[in-house]
Amino acid sequence: MLLTELLTPDQVVMPVVARDKSGVIAELTRHLANRWGCDYAEVLGAVQEREAGGSTGIGFGVAIPHARSAGVPELSLVCGVSPSPVPFDSIDGEPVRLFFLIVGPPASAGQHVKVLGRIAKLVRHEPVRRRLFEAATPSEFYNVLLDAEAR
């Protein structure tokens, strides 16, 4: 599954305004809940519970908070870019500027794992990360992903 099949430019939050980990998770979850008409509190609780089990900061300035929740009808993705680094307890100890929030219903476990892997594979490449960090608009961010996935 391609990320661009789950994402549209209106699902890219730019700029992320929260300055701490819990605030970023809440901000992105609010965007997801508003976009799909989900129960914000239920989805936020699921994401926070997953994050409490271990940080989803994967290094290189990237975090992939994720959860499964009956509060969402289908696998959903919201991305965000912060103008300044946010402390996130990442595995490399570095703060984060690039966020990918994935939430899906319990039955979407297989797709969920594939999307996690797809994101990790794409952001491992420094040129892709740099272009995502430098994207000036949600459309530009989306087009960077589109281009990266076409390769």
Residue locations for each model-derived region?
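Cytosolic covalent-transfer regions centered on His/Cys nucleophiles
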Residues: 1-151
